[in-house]
Amino acid sequence: MDEALRLQARAARAEVEAGTLRGEVLLELVLSIPFLDRDPWVDELLGIEPPPDVPSLPRGSVPYLPCGVDEILAMVRDVPLRPDDELVDLGSGLGRPLVLAHLLSGARCHGVEIHEPLVRSAKALCSALHLQAVTFVHADASESELDGSVFFLYAPFNGEMLARVVRRIEAVARRRSIVVCTVGLELRDVAWLEPRSSSNVSLSLYTSKVDRHG
């Protein structure tokens, strides 16, 4: 990313901090950035720094890797995410998906992350941007009570941990209709999820089909 784009992102960050850059205007700005520069540009916009060191990975979790901006844009558009939604990111990392999704949609956002250094960084980012509707908690998603209308997973778990997380999400689906969004993770074998179409080849969408009257 060249210096002109970096300066543009920093100028836009001031508008985000002031609460004046949101929604469609922000979306048009992000889409105007060349594809290969889009991820680092958004990180500069949001003030996301390189990830801090994290301790050894618990069994069933995977190393931190941020989700691509285009997958986030597709998720916001395809769900579609609205101001009355609550988006929950399981394995939320430094917060790129949640912060960008909130700025674009106005939805309340909540992240669950097992690595405390990443949680501290994500909280500091939201504080700097004055975003009170985006929160993060240090917790094991497979052991947490969950709630929300939209769930996002960027391949954060595998094996038995993933199975436990899916059961936690199913418990929410038994109370309310939800949408589950995944990147790099297929859940087509989960009986209570109905696959939906997606505009991005890496993004999978599912609607819950749990009998909430049984």
Predicted regions located by residue number:
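S-adenosyl-L-methionine
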Residues: M1-R82
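Conserved class I S-adenosyl-L-methionine
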Residues: D84-G93
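Conserved SAM-binding motif I beta-strand of class I
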Residues: R108-E113
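Conserved SAM-binding loop
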Residues: A122-K123
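Conserved SAM-binding strand-loop segment of SAM-dependent methyltransferases
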Residues: H130-A139
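A short SAM/SAH-binding and catalytic strip from SAM-dependent methyltransferases
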Residues: S149-L162
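C-terminal substrate-binding/active-site "lid" region of AdoMet-derived donor-dependent transferases
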Residues: E160-V210
